[in-house]
Each structure stands twice: as structure tokens, then as C-alpha cells.
């Protein structure tokens, strides 16, 4: 068979590390949902600002916005 049986006595628990101990409080909130909208409006603002940033970069790339002193090929 391809499967292997492990005895209960020889099985060790999870290994404790310093990084794991530091990150454990962050994982303790797993599965909990804040009531209401939470930070959804903040995320919407961040997405809108990112869209504006991308449109500015696109306009510069397409030479729609002319910048003084910068030559575009």
C-alpha cells in the first residue's frame, strides 16, 4: 500500500518557534467578522486612489499629458 500508518506514541506535536509565537495573536482573530461595514469604505477610497494613479500613469505613457522638460520618444 502507498499509505503509512503512524503510531500515536511516535507522533510529535507542532514545533514552537519564535516567529510563530509572535504571529499567534494575529491569527487569534481568524473567522471573526466585524459587525457592519467595517473598513469597506476605506478600501473603496484606496481602490479609487489607485485607479486614479493608474490612469495618470497611462496618460503619461500615451503622451496624453505633456510634461515640460521631459522628452518622450
Swiss-Prot record:
GO molecular function list: phosphate ion binding
Specify whether Thylakoid is a keyword of the entry.
yes
User: Which Gene Ontology cellular-component terms appear in the entry?
Assistant: chloroplast thylakoid membrane; photosystem II
User: What does the record list as GO biological process?
Assistant: photosynthesis; protein stabilization
The protein's matches in SUPFAM superfamilies, at most eight in alphabetical order, are given as:
Photosystem II 10 kDa phosphoprotein PsbH (SSF161025)
Q: How does it sit in the membrane?
A: Single-pass membrane protein
Region annotation (Disordered) maps to 1-21
Q: Which Pfam families match?
A: PsbH
Key words of the record: Chloroplast, Membrane, Phosphoprotein, Photosynthesis, Photosystem II, Plastid, Thylakoid, Transmembrane, Transmembrane helix
State whether keyword Nucleus applies. no
Q: Which sequence ranges form a coiled-coil region, renumbered to this chain? A: none
Q: Family assignment?
A: Belongs to the PsbH family.
Q: What does this protein do?
A: One of the components of the core complex of photosystem II (PSII), required for its stability and/or assembly. PSII is a light-driven water:plastoquinone oxidoreductase that uses light energy to abstract electrons from H(2)O, generating O(2) and a proton gradient subsequently used for ATP formation. It consists of a core antenna complex that captures photons, and an electron transfer chain that converts photonic excitation into a charge separation.
For this protein, the record's HAMAP family field holds: PSII_PsbH
Quote the subunit structure annotation. Answer: PSII is composed of 1 copy each of membrane proteins PsbA, PsbB, PsbC, PsbD, PsbE, PsbF, PsbH, PsbI, PsbJ, PsbK, PsbL, PsbM, PsbT, PsbX, PsbY, PsbZ, Psb30/Ycf12, at least 3 peripheral proteins of the oxygen-evolving complex and a large number of cofactors. It forms dimeric complexes.
Q: What is this protein called?
A: Photosystem II reaction center protein H
Organism annotation: Helianthus annuus
Amino acid at each position: 500500500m502507498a499509505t503509512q500508518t503512524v503510531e500515536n506514541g511516535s507522533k510529535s506535536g507542532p514545533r514552537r518557534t519564535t516567529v510563530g509565537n509572535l504571529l499567534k495573536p494575529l491569527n487569534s482573530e481568524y473567522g471573526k467578522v466585524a459587525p457592519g461595514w467595517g473598513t469597506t469604505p476605506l478600501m473603496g477610497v484606496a481602490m479609487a486612489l489607485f485607479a486614479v494613479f493608474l490612469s495618470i500613469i497611462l496618460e503619461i505613457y500615451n503622451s496624453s499629458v505633456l510634461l515640460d522638460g521631459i522628452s518622450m520618444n
